[in-house]
Swiss-Prot record:
Family in the record: Belongs to the UPF0473 family.
Superkingdom of this protein's organism: Bacteria
Protein name stated in the entry: UPF0473 protein EF_1204
Matches recorded under InterPro entries: UPF0473
Native source species: Enterococcus faecalis (strain ATCC 700802 / V583)
Amino acid sequence: MTEHNHDHDHEGHEHITLVDEQGNETLYEILLTVDGQEEFGKNYVLLYPAGIPEDEDVELQAYSYVENAEGTEGDLQQIETDAEWDMIEEVFNTFMAEEEE
C-alpha cells in the first residue's frame, strides 16, 4: 500500500506525491483517472514521474485507489486482476488515440 497526497499546480497538471515504505516522497503527474466503480468497485489512476520532457519515454504506473471524503488523500493499491489490466489498457489506448488526433 502506498500513501498519496494530491497537489495542483498553476499549469493545469494534477500531481500526486507517493510515499514509499522508507518515507521517501516522489512527485508524479497524473496522466488520467479511470472510473471503474461499476465494473470493479474502485477507481484507477495512471501516473508518470513529474518533470520528464514530453519527448522522452516514461514508464507509466497504474494503481487502484480509494480517496478520503475530502478527495485529498487515500491509499493506492496494486492492480490485482487481468480483467482490471485489460480495462485500463483499453482506456489508455483510447486516450492516446484521441491525443494523437
